[in-house]
Amino acid sequence: MIQVLLVTICLAAFPYQGSSIILESGNVNDYEVVYPRKVTALPKGAVQQKYEDAMQYEFKVNGEPVVLHLEKNKGLFSKDYSEIHYSPDGRRITTHPLVEDHCYYRGHIRNDADSTASISACNGLKGHFKLQGEMYLIEPMKMSYSEAHAVYKYGNVEKEDEAPKMCGVTQNWESYEPIKKASQLIVSTEFQRYMEIVIVVDHSMVKKYNGDSDKIKAWVYEMINTITESYSYLYIDIILSGLEIWSEKDLINVETSAENTLKSFGEWRAKDLIHRISHDNAQLLTATDFDGPTIGLAYVASMCDPKRSVGVVQDHSSVNRLVAITLAHEMAHNLGVRHDEGSCSCGSGYTCIMSPVINSEVIKYFSDCSYIQCREYISKENPPCILNKPLRTDTVSTPVSGNELLEAGKDYD
């Protein structure tokens, strides 16, 4: 027998339309105030977790009721996930936090087969969902006395900077010829791959977020949760193996030149990071404003290479999804994916992830071209580091090392 626990998050049962508001994502024009109602089904006698494996929320969008179904992203963290920061005297401190009961979810809207959702439920609902072909953002409103949330379309966020933003990769590498049509590629479970990544946050990010490591972590977790949704189309699982925060100073010279920073980061990874944390790919997240319109750069077709399986990404927007898409873009270059051209498509009217320019349009998915190029790169090169399937965090019955602290010079097995 199933007992249904109905939790009314707010007594208000009606939405409210607003014209302008300042939210975490920036100034938003034309938003809707909603009061989600949580409906959770628990088996009789089951222990209530802080964050259930599956949850449902009911609210209204444009006056129509919707049911948001969420399932915990259990593959988000590796079983030996670690976090690293540095003490004022330069000691490296490594922790292995318990991440089994995290608050990051993927999901869909009930009765909308084409819907998707990527949501943080840590403090209210924050993230995005696609409903009837439209991308909506949702986040709690800054009112301590209420559980009100704002729902709005991405296009209603006032742009921070109208200047075009671009990936620094140029189209000067060899393509895999001939390019097949998507229908000619055979898809089976043998094509599933698993990319364990480490995110390195530089000191400019620490300054940008006023030294608030919890805020930095939440920002990164939300990004990774978003890109796991995007990469499922390419049959690639993205798993976060580690998060390193350069809390006191940068360990490389982070320059406004994206090219120089990428080179330095790759060299540092090969001589340092790769020996401390098991991972396949590393990305540097920086608040440094790269020269010109560049907001990201990565080596192409370089997966598993110690120096070149890396990218650098500028934290260029207050909209988490936009930075996450930039991260997904640079990682795809490592997987042999090129910039989209005019014939590439990810749905009518949509801008695709591998567009060389980020503009005001909603960026949705990888294109058909990206799918083909990724599959052909994997088929031809078969990068070995992404073949092994890591254990998920929910398979670990006890913590590996609890919250063990390690100083510089001590290794973790």
Curated annotation (Swiss-Prot):
Q: Which domain of life is it from?
A: Eukaryota
Molecular-function GO term, any one: metalloendopeptidase activity
The record's similarity note reads: Belongs to the venom metalloproteinase (M12B) family. P-I subfamily.
Subcellular location per the Swiss-Prot or TrEMBL entry = Secreted
Q: In which tissues is it expressed?
A: Expressed by the venom gland.
**Which residue numbers delimit the Peptidase M12B domain?**
193-390
Q: What is its EC number?
A: 3.4.24.-
Residues cleaved off as propeptide: 21-187, 391-413
Instruction: Provide the alphabetized UniProt keywords.
Output: Calcium, Disulfide bond, Hemorrhagic toxin, Hemostasis impairing toxin, Hydrolase, Metal-binding, Metalloprotease, Protease, Secreted, Signal, Toxin, Zinc, Zymogen
Determine if Hydrolase is one of this entry's keywords: yes
What is this protein's function? This protein is a zinc metalloprotease from snake venom that possesses hemorrhagic activity.
Any one cellular-component term (Gene Ontology) = plasma membrane
Q: Quaternary form?
A: Monomer.
Instruction: Report the record's Gene Ontology biological process terms.
Output: proteolysis; venom-mediated hemorrhage in another organism
Binding of Zn(2+) occurs at H329, H333, H339
The entry marks the following residues as binding Ca(2+), namely E196, D280, C385, N388
Disulfide topology: C304-C385, C344-C369, C346-C352
Alphabetical list of Pfam families matching this protein: Pep_M12B_propep (PF01562), Reprolysin (PF01421)
Protein name (Swiss-Prot/TrEMBL): Snake venom metalloproteinase acutolysin-A
What's the source species' lineage? Eukaryota, Metazoa, Chordata, Craniata, Vertebrata
Q: Quote the record's cofactor note.
A: Binds 1 zinc ion per subunit.
